[in-house]
Amino acid sequence: MKSKKKGKKASESLTIMNELVLPNDTNVFGNLMGGRLMYWMDIAAGIAAGKHCSTPSMTASVDNLSFKNPIKLGNVVHIEAKVCRAFNTSMEIHIKVWGKDLLHEYEYESNEAYFTFVALDPNGKPRSVPALIPETDEEKKLFDGALRRRQLRLILAGKMKPNDATELKALFV
């Protein structure tokens, strides 16, 4: 088992998935259904989490899921997921989604979200995860913002008092 002190690079968790949007994946307007996309995003996030912690994990929350542009029937869904911060037993995974129109040869940003996964031991109990080592400027930016996003999640879940959210308070002082 890897030591939490050493950590793993964010890039080691990068997961890329591609799916073709078929008729069964679409609504009456020919757009990819949001639930199907969320299913694929959850799979990508789970794989990224597994690459980071080398153990099964489960979805704990989904935050800031935005739908910017619909993905049409026949287009390819391109999903990239990467762990952006590791806490004690949980990991925040950033996911970006693009649509690729192969016929007209262009791609467009479609969705973005943050998933939180909790690592599990063989008995299904939370277990510690390795620290995360951000390397690129983007990875460092996501890493720095993850603590604020986590504090907001904990406040909204009633697990943290707003006065204890030091990172969030610093934004307003």
Model features per residue range: what roles?
Residues 29, 39, 67, 114-117, ...:
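Aromatic side chains
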Residues 2-17, 72-73, 84-173:
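HotDog/MaoC-like acyl-thioester-processing domains
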Residues 26-38, 170-173:
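A conserved, well-ordered hydrophobic junction motif at loop->secondary-structure transitions
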Residues 20-25:
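A short small-residue
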